[in-house]
Amino acid sequence: EQKEQQFALDQANKWQEISQYMEILIKGQKKETNGLRIPSDMKPAYFEWIIWRSILAIDSLVNSPEQVRKFKIDADFLPIFTAPGGTADLVAEFKDYRLAVEVTLSESSRQEAMEGEPVRRHVADLCQKRDIPTFGLFLARKVHTNTAETFRHGLWYYDDDSPVDLKIVPFSLEEFKNLFDWLFENKIENKAQKLRILLESCLQGKDSLTAPEWKKTMKETIKNQILVSNSL
């Protein structure tokens, strides 16, 4: 556990490597790139692992690195398997909010069928804690419009018919990478808080938008945040 804590502390210094791994996934590269490669049969596990590392790099966590990840790692902190079903892939707890992260390599119209209900259920389960707000972050190489539409309708009903409004934001991996790179290239302070502000911005006004409009708005929200900050 102490070694994993040290591994976690090192991640902010490894942000460029983390970003390169994201790039490998985005482009589907099979060959070694800058000394890094993802075994083809391990892509789903590496996707979870890379995003876990990105959250450790963002830091400000209240829960331990081990509690954030739901997948098993080996002695070199490499992933062995993907997270089991029944829970979010990653759960990061910050001082004033909780972030449930779900990742998928599926891109077709099957994406919504495979991910829509489980992701919403996992976020709803965490919302029952009610101690701090819970946000969901859904990451895919490409977010299918029907998946975005499912998350746009945030309402979920528990078994006793009580409702909860789920705050789930779907980003493409490229959008998340752009945001991640910006946080570190510009040495942004309180990265976790900046992430929350951006998630809240993406959720604003979604009820009056169509799914394609919402996807476009989220892309522009990230782009504008980066452009505005870079021009200061």
Describe every region a protein language model picked out:
Residues K3-N230:
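Catalytic core segments in nucleotide and nucleic-acid processing enzymes
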